[in-house]
From Swiss-Prot:
Keyword Zinc-finger (UniProt): no
Protein task: Involved in peptidoglycan biosynthesis. Transports lipid-linked peptidoglycan precursors from the inner to the outer leaflet of the cytoplasmic membrane.
Pathway(s) where this gene product acts: Cell wall biogenesis; peptidoglycan biosynthesis
Name of the protein described by the UniProt record: Probable lipid II flippase MurJ
Keywords, sorted A to Z: Cell inner membrane, Cell membrane, Cell shape, Cell wall biogenesis/degradation, Membrane, Peptidoglycan synthesis, Transmembrane, Transmembrane helix, Transport
GO biological process: cell wall organization; lipid translocation; peptidoglycan biosynthetic process; regulation of cell shape
Amino acid sequence: MSLVKKFATVGGATLGSRLFGFIRETFMAAALGTGPVADAFNTAFRLPNTFRRLFAEGAFNSAFVPLFAKEIEAHGMDGARRFSEEVFGVLFTVLLLLTIAMELSMPFIVGQLIAPGFADDPAKFTSTVTFATIMFPYLACMSLAAMMAGMLNSLHRYFAAAIAPVFLNFILIAVLAYAWYSGQDAVAVGYDLSWGVLAAGLVQLAIVWVAVRNAGIRIGFRRPRLTPNVKRLLVLALPAAITGGITQINLLINTNIASAKEGAVSSLVYADRIYQLPLGVVGIAVATVLLPELARALRGGNLNEAANLQNRSVEFTLFLTLPAAAALLVMSEPIVRLLFERGQFSPESTVVVGHILAIYGLGLPAFVLIKAFIPGFFAREDTRTPMIFAGISVAVNVSLALTLFPSLAASGIATAEIVAGWVNALLLFATLVWRGHWGRDIPLLTRIPRLVIAAAIMAAALYVAVDWLAFPLSSAAPLSTRALTLCGLIAAAMAIYFAVAFGIGGASLSMIRRSVKRGASASSVERASEGADRQ
């Protein structure tokens, strides 16, 4: 399977999950708006969800995948199964102890670390603690699922791990639909959603567990022991946890700061949901596929192939991310209005969330590039350098957020996030170049400015069109009119971008065909080699 096809497999499944996530957030916005229960649930959910993103999309896969792949190469499937059982025993024990400790200390964690601003509102504080207590075991489910997803990715089976998250949205949509049908109040909806999150974690764990068994690996429980392999995993995973979870660390810090203002937490969450669509579809797909592919190339001593993988991944991410960033910058309010403005979500909320979303658009390329750059370190088993840069990024984020929040509120926090993201991305790239791990690639260097020009032309056209179509995009127009107008604008913008990008040489069909053929050829060789090994 070619690199592009692998990106498409993971990205397509992620796209499905994110689209259902939009439906979920639309229902939630109508039911809870940006009121106190919305703040309580979003804050409570951020705690396990932060660890979910960190483990499922960052630290665990980054550390586990290269070691698991090495075990397959050195000792075959039996060695890989033994290694996975050793890790499973330690991970399960740690998660059990962590869950118990967190459940017992949840009032302190919420009141002192996550949302100290809620202490002045006893009802909101109590709801947040209760919701978080119900949902926190979701972390254990998703951490175990992340381990199994890493195994599947190493075996080039991407679909099950990528599609599992959609079931969180399925279950929460069903919960919200039932709440609407039965006429529940906001607090009852918050309780139902919390139990729904826990149920979704169990379902997702079951899906990847079945997929691993179908792949031929049956994981048994071993008494937890710090074997050499497990120690190596922990050494790699700790700094990778900080590095891969930099966005999540920033989100937790920002939640702490935002809790001082009513509605700020929920406004950031709603904007983040929209911005996560392109970030998830492109960034997570690239990071998930690139790490095992890059590790394989480096193990084989194929430095040219490794350099080509990195360059084509950056090219691919920018080709899709730059127009998405431009669209978020220009069309933020119409997008938020269409998706969320109904029920308890007011026009004033649309303006606030729209401003935050436009700011996130400026940072989108940085966060996607981070996901493309980090595998260049992790595949070489260097997790320390990205950890240092992550620490610098956190310091930038915290200092700016504290400085800007008093005057700009939630928009100040969003600004701090994107500045920190760009600092992190630039440090990662500069270090790869300085160490000679990023070869000069003429096609990439010539295409990037052309893609920027294409995105700028598209943004200018959208700016004029949004002003000209102000009424069809306003809340005074029927929902169907707004939806058709926005979809038409997006389609026209895509046509303009692709026409300009291909027209001025930012992209070419021959480039795409070469990528597919190169990946198909590599896959054929890989399959032949695997067949010879089995014989």
